[in-house]
Amino acid sequence: MQQHLTPWMVESAYRYLKAAKHLKCGHDMLDIAQINAAVGMEILLKSFVSKPNGKLGQADETYELDYGAIKVAHDHLRTVGKIPAYRKDRPPNKHDLLTLFYAIPEPIRVRIRLDRHEHWIEKDREVFTNSRYRYENGAPKGYDDILVGVLDELIDEVVAWYREQGCRDLFIVCYGMPPLERWPDRD
């Protein structure tokens, strides 16, 4: 299982999810919502292949990627023919959602129910890198909100798993709690 928990990354992914949910309700903003969900998904997946590298245990803890795990995942995908032709002879793409998916140990993927979303992760594996600028030649002409829903489900599962691991991070502990009601001012 994962040696180091990275709750700040989970919180960051959640923030991108919240932005995506707001954006998908805006006029002509679905593409931007999808990109925000892709960034959130990238951060969430990277949270499982990262380890703290500074300010351990503090609110502003920093992390570094395990490039070894990403390379192993990339090599596996190349072996099974799931690396796009234009990337075959290039180093691993640390933004590729499918590579990040396979960098996560399988028992964790199963526990957080990530495995059931592999199809959507593969479909949207390059949304962030290939869809940021819709005016570019080759940019997708259609968008959807599926990744928003997948990220929403996964954050719930990841937070539950972090709680099982005994994580005491404030975001993890308070996640899902209703906001406190303010009492009316007494005049």
Q: Where are these predicted regions, by residue range?
A:
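Long, charged low-complexity segments
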Residues: 1-8, 18, 53-187
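Non-catalytic amphipathic alpha-helical adaptor/oligomerization segments
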Residues: 9, 35, 43, 57-58
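A long, hydrophobic alpha-helical segment
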Residues: 13-31
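Short, hydrophobic, well-ordered secondary-structure elements
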Residues: 20, 30-52
